[in-house]
A protein has these predicted regions:
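Short, solvent-exposed mixed-charge patches
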Residues: 130-131
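Substrate-binding/catalytic cleft of secreted carbohydrate-active enzymes
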Residues: 1-127
Length: 131
């Protein structure tokens, strides 16, 4: 058995504390997997990494960096899976400028272009593989 959770820290709600200071109390001895995390960005859109509403690659990359910092504080963490690899069509995404019928949480755009957060996750997984 494993425990899997979806947690969108920094996207749907702000961080309650600095990511590096987030303490997780895991009350089970089972392996824990973060089965979904991330946030949306339009490929090629630049903006302030501190402004969630910018939908920028810089904000998405910061969000991933923050989550990676938090992962170090999670007991029993055995794996993480960003939501999602590619941007995809979604009929329930109504923001006319940034979504227009697309879920933009992908690490890769719908045209196959790698967003800045893709490189962060590649480096994260490479580091984990080598440890």
């Amino acid at each position: 058995d494993v425990v899997a959770i979806n947690k969108y820290m920094g996207w749907y709600h702000p961080w309650p504390v600095e990511p590096k200071d987030a303490i997780w109390e895991v009350v089970t001895d089972k392996p824990l997997i973060i089965s979904e995390f991330g946030g949306e960005a339009l490929y090629g859109q630049s903006g302030d990494e501190n402004v969630v509403s910018s939908w920028s690659e810089e904000y998405q990359a910061r969000l991933y960096r923050d989550n990676i910092r938090m992962f170090d504080n999670i007991p029993n963490l055995r794996g993480v899976s960003p939501w999602i690899l590619f941007d995809f069509r979604s009929p329930f995404r109504f923001h006319p400028t940034n979504q227009d019928g697309w879920n933009r949480k992908g690490l890769i755009s719908d045209q196959g272009m790698r967003k800045k957060a893709w490189y962060l996750m590649r480096d994260y997984y490479m580091k984990k593989r080598n440890n």
